[in-house]
Amino acid sequence: MTFREKMPTSPKSPLRRRRSSWTGTWLNHQTTSFKQAVSAVIQAQSPRSRFKSLSSDFSDVDRTLSLSDSLLLKILEKLPESQNEDVSLVCKRWLSVQGRRLRSMKVFDWEFLLSGRLVSRFPKLTSVDLVNACFNPSSNSGILLCHTSISFHVSTDSSLNLNFVEESLLDNEMVDKGLRVLGRGSFDLIKLVVINATELGLLSLAEDCSDLQELELHKCSDNLLRGIAACENLRGLRLVGSVDGLYSSSVSDIGLTILAQGCKRLVKLELSGCEGSFDGIKAIGQCCEVLEELSICDHRMDDGWIAALSYFESLKTLLISSCRKIDSSPGPGKLLGSCPALESLQLRRCCLNDKEGMRALFKVCDGVTKVNIQDCWGLDDDSFSLAKAFRRVRFLSLEGCSILTTSGLESVILHWEELESMRVVSCKNIKDSEISAALSSLFSLLKELTWRPDTRSHLSSSLEGTGIGKRGSKFFKKR
């Protein structure tokens, strides 16, 4: 029997079955209807389908390459700040473009600056803080020393040496070298914070960064201020001389006079831990004619400096903070002038038990409209009574004045005819029960009143009826 004779002739045989077509596949499928089959055929023959097949071949192509860096930068600027780190991880180009967005930087690694990576990675920086990077890092140390804007690691042996902070600082030449590197690459620099720099470093920076407007100099000295005249466009300046427990430096009348003659366009000035006297403050007032804000922190000035404040013709805000004394011997009251444009007087964390200094200060600032006294000790009724010298107070804020009483407050504010707003917080000797009818009548005329003198009584009244703050006998009964 031949092979042909053995072939089965039954139509149901699998060898005689016709090859299935695409129509049979669609039509014979149990879950596919005829309408779905027709729709699939039409979609397969459409140009859009052919376009999809072509575009799928370019799925791995970076389409942002067709965008210029400036256009890509504008797009990335629309993203929220929370996505900045994610954007930098996309590719090297996005990392570079993202670096141009950053405007402010606090540097912790000095080698990152010296190597040039800071200015190449972030070419558009306008604000740079180098203070923390100016300290030699202590290896294998878990002790972190923090003081306001300064923080660095110290070794366990530092407690045996009282000058460990100054010894941890980079030397002057190294700091000046970093300023030269920064100046050559950061032409848009507007603000700089640095410590332990010298006159030469400041001069080199001023030559390259002509737009520098704000400068903060820690461990400042008279010699350093000799190079400040090169910063012609300086508008804001903060000088930190000595800081108790960290480092010591001297800014005397010599430095203040150099500052006054070299920075005549100053609008904002802060003197922290600086020395000086009447002559230095007077020079600033006479030369810096557009100065509007003066801050004096932890001053070490000689007596009589307050009288020089009358030479500031454009001063609008005076802030005195963290001072152990105001002025022990301000001189005769007849010789004290006043600041004609002064609007706001702020006293924070100061010792105000110096009656003569307070009397002189309030007389010089007699034209202020805003008075803010916060967390000051020594402000009793007698000291606060000197505030009657103010003639045009519209806003008063008292916070943390624990010695001042209700009668002491009342005796002063009833003399202020223009008072519109008042804020009294955490002054425990000012009692609600001691408010007189005259004081209550004054409160009703104020436009704004924040009255929380005794926070403990305020908390008790707010929790009344809630059951909170009572003894636990209700919940811990003996069974």
From Swiss-Prot:
Residues covered by the F-box domain:
62-108
Spell out the residue ranges making up region: Disordered: 1-20
SUPFAM superfamilies associated with the record? F-box domain (SSF81383), RNI-like (SSF52047)
Q: Which PANTHER family match?
A: F-BOX DOMAIN-CONTAINING PROTEIN, PARTNER OF PAIRED, ISOFORM B-RELATED
Name by which UniProt lists this protein: F-box protein At5g51380
